Amino acid sequence: MKCKGIVAIGPGDPRLIDVDVPDPGPHEVQVKMAATLVSAGTERAWVNGIPNATPAYPYIPGYCCAGEVVKTGSEVVGFEPGDRVATFAVDVGHREIGNVRDLEVVHIPEGVSYEHAAFTSLGQTSLQGVRKCKIELGESVASLGLGIVGILAMQFTHLAGAQPAIALD
């Protein structure tokens, strides 16, 4: 099977082309994407070929996405066709259909849109940073940079009890 996908052929050369979609492997979930998200810093570095930040060309950018399970591999437990899922998986995001390891997929709760669920991986990244800092009630925190990860991190530091929480961009 084939689907449309954005493929970075080389630095500064992304193209919308047909890409192959193999059957999912034993521990993979095949997802039909409903929403993908551009993580500006990471994807700009990848597409522009920034040293030490770029996968080998060609590659499919995008790792923040949400959609519906189409098929599951033979060893997958807990997911079935029709499930709404969000995923954090490199080389899958900006394409119509992709295979994702079952450990990189989470169910989307009822009432959450695909567009909001696509932010799951960026929320996970910012929350991990806040947890590693082990913020305690009343500690002050400053965030340098207010991209989406910085904004989410500031929200999580506030919820963790940081005061004051200072945002600098």
Give residue ranges: language-model regions.
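Short, conserved catalytic or interaction motifs in soluble domains
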Residues: 74, 110, 135
